[in-house]
Amino acid sequence: MFTARMARPMANESAPAASFAAPGSSGAPVADCLLEVRGVGKSFPGVVALDGVQFRVRRGTVHALMGENGAGKSTLMKIIAGVYTPDQGEILINGEPVVLSGPLDALDRGIAMIHQELNLMPYMTVAENIWIRREPKNRFGLIDHAALRRRTAALFERLSIDIDPEADVRTLTVASRQMVEIAKAVSFDSDVLIMDEPTSALTDKEVSHLFRIIRQLREQGKGIVYITHKMNELFEIADEFSVFRDGKYIGTHASTDVTRDDIIRMMVGREITQMFPKEDVPIGDVVLAVKNLGVDGVFRDVSFELRAGEILGVAGLVGSGRSNVAEALFGVVPATAGEIRIDGKPVRITTPAQAMKHGMAFLTEDRKDTGCFLNLDLLANMEAAVLSNRYVKFNFVRQAQLKRDCEAMSRMLRVKTPGLHEEIQNLSGGNQQKVLIGRWLLTQPRILILDEPTRGIDVGAKAEIHRLVSALAGKGVAVLMISSEMPEVLGMSDRVMVMHEGRMTGIVERKDADQVRIMDLASR
């Protein structure tokens, strides 16, 4: 999939704005161009997020947007969706310059955005969420619920979505909520749909369904903007792609004209020589031993050992119970069965505080809901896990030392930020993830549990985190790494534990692990 030959030489990556052209043409005709951005710039305090960028979406195409975290992708999409106002430049819709006053104005003009962090109302029904503020009314001016159900059912039939319109959103899986968001965007009959990392929490089957919907929309003449870090998705679904780097536009190409390595070079401005820098380090004594661990109704009979310096990967399909095991180990949801031993001694862990006293750290899979304090700054986020240990003396926090260590950690992890007092919600997803990793490294853990450590992170940041994890293992940290990305599991793990429907189905040594064997165990 990644061996497509270059059909023509790569364009100059630093080409000026005037040289922009759609792939395979000398410039898309205005009638073919649904949306165009010219010379758009946007700055925040201490940060130039976009520097005179350009972008174009053509009718009946899927246009992927690629770039490292912090490249400016999300900022540009929020400008197009009316969330932000650009400091300079212009936006053209169907060839006409427009000034968007807000998201509702963008919707009225045919632009809908499906955010990575879903924006549904959990205590409302599926139908109510889709048609909010547009509900059909009866002759008394009240909501016509029968018409609402019929309208939703017709929309779902059109998109081959099998979800009960009357179900409360809070009862749906993440994948089902994603489909509801897509249906809501389609319900506006928008010409341009922006999808931000839409497959980050989907199974392979759900991704295939999503791609069928995208192809259907493309055939209807819609323009799809598809933000992703996954190379295989770009080659499978995108007609063309644009790359941004450090707030600048780098180039646009047809997806058939480039290789995976070409795109990585455009994204990071350098070669990534080793994506999975797993070091051969001495494996020490057993640090964590788990026997017949279980949580009633969730998972059962999970047994494994984790040694100092070892990276134990955990694989399995979405819903297999991988994250639940991590939560039980860390005391988020205490185990109801089984035994946990640390350094050979049985321990009972019913709270995260108890887990931390035993030298554990836990990076959760959902940085928005269970990781970041979005309204607080980097310093507050990074220090959150250490305020009860070595930085507190006689009930006083050693603020100066803590700040110095947080600054050093931020530099080591190469967090892109104006300073420690920047609100974390203003950072890209990859930089937020680095801050959370830094939070736990400050606790100097002996056992590090990582749940989807590189989800939603660009290829350059992935390699950085892989190097960091490998280095930690080299220092004797025992790492339990849960990941839905098969190359990551195979490339980084000394052994791979596989789960299916709440059961552990096997543990495979690194030398014996391959995708076929892991998937066989994951589907038993």
Curated annotation (Swiss-Prot):
The keyword Membrane applies. It catalyses: D-ribose(out) + ATP + H2O = D-ribose(in) + ADP + phosphate + H(+); D-galactose(out) + ATP + H2O = D-galactose(in) + ADP + phosphate + H(+). Part of an ABC transporter complex involved in carbohydrate import. Could be involved in ribose, galactose and/or methyl galactoside import. Responsible for energy coupling to the transport system. Its EC number is 7.5.2.11, 7.5.2.7. Its main location: membrane. It comes from Burkholderia ambifaria (strain ATCC BAA-244 / DSM 16087 / CCUG 44356 / LMG 19182 / AMMD). The keyword Repeat applies. It is an enzyme of class 7 (translocase). ATP binds at residues 67-74. Pfam families: ABC_tran. This is Putative ribose/galactose/methyl galactoside import ATP-binding protein 2. Residues 35-271, 281-520 form the ABC transporter domain.
